[in-house]
Amino acid sequence: MASGVMVSDDVVKVFNDMKVRHQLSPEEAKKRKKAVIFCLSDDKKTIILEPGKEILQGDVGCNVEDPYKTFVKMLPRNDCRYALYDALYETKETKKEDLVFVFWAPEEASLKSKMIYASSKDAIRKRFTGIKHEWQTNTYDDINDPCNLADKLGGNTVVSLEGKSLRS
């Protein structure tokens, strides 16, 4: 079911900037987004960037110790959101970096919010071409455990996420 919700050009630009991996100067690399959260505009007609809800690569290791935990804390407990998370992980063979599209629909969100976000997901998903990993999660316990993200990225082959070991 389509909701008729539009995706703002800023959202598409952020996605394209996060998706393209090319040589950046050290200053440009610091400004690259590690995570960003999207929400519906107040009139519920457009998917927009949620103000102040982003993590920059330059923040990691400075004022953001654990980017994944910081990302999870940015999500509201009682409302839906879409997000992009640039996951840095290691498999048994190699280090990888992939974008993950997250649809956060917590059980505590209103039925109306869940319905409009669910029916609008295709609008944003169609604009995010080339995403390999998509994750819909509904409980804080589920999203708070980095092993669940690792399962989406490659299951048991993932040994670390953001430089932190996952399995012993």
Curated annotation (Swiss-Prot):
UniProt motif (Nuclear localization signal) ranges: 30-34
Modified positions (N-acetylalanine) in chain numbering: A2
Record-linked PROSITE patterns: ADF_H
Lineage: Eukaryota, Metazoa, Chordata, Craniata, Vertebrata
ADF-H domain: residues covered: 4-153
Molecular function via GO: actin filament binding
GO CC annotations on file: actin cytoskeleton; cell cortex; cytoplasm; membrane; midbody; nuclear matrix
Family: Belongs to the actin-binding proteins ADF family.
Function, as annotated: May play a role in the regulation of cell morphology and cytoskeletal organization. Binds to F-actin and exhibits pH-sensitive F-actin depolymerizing activity. Required for formation of the cleavage furrow during cytokinesis.
Protein name: Cofilin-1-B
Alphabetized UniProt keyword annotations: Acetylation, Actin-binding, Cytoplasm, Cytoskeleton, Membrane, Nucleus, Phosphoprotein
Signal sequence region: none
Tissue expression pattern: Expressed diffusely in both animal and vegetal hemispheres of the oocyte. During cleavage, expression accumulates around the cleavage furrow, along the vegetal membrane, and later in the midbody. Strongly expressed in the animal hemisphere during blastula stages, with most cells showing expression by gastrulation. By stage 17, expression is highest in cells of the developing neuroectoderm, and at stage 24 the notochord, neural tube, neural crest, somites and some cells of the archenteron show high expression.
Species this protein is from: Xenopus laevis
GO BP term (any one): regulation of cell morphogenesis
PTM annotation: Inactive when phosphorylated. Phosphorylation levels vary during development. Oocytes contain only the phosphorylated form, and 80-95% of cfl1 protein is phosphorylated in unfertilized eggs. Rapid dephosphorylation occurs within 30 minutes after fertilization. Phosphorylation levels increase again between the morula and blastula stages (5-8 hpf) and then decrease again as gastrulation approaches. Dephosphorylated by pdxp.
Record localization: Nucleus matrix; Cytoplasm, Cytoskeleton; Cytoplasm, Cell cortex; Membrane
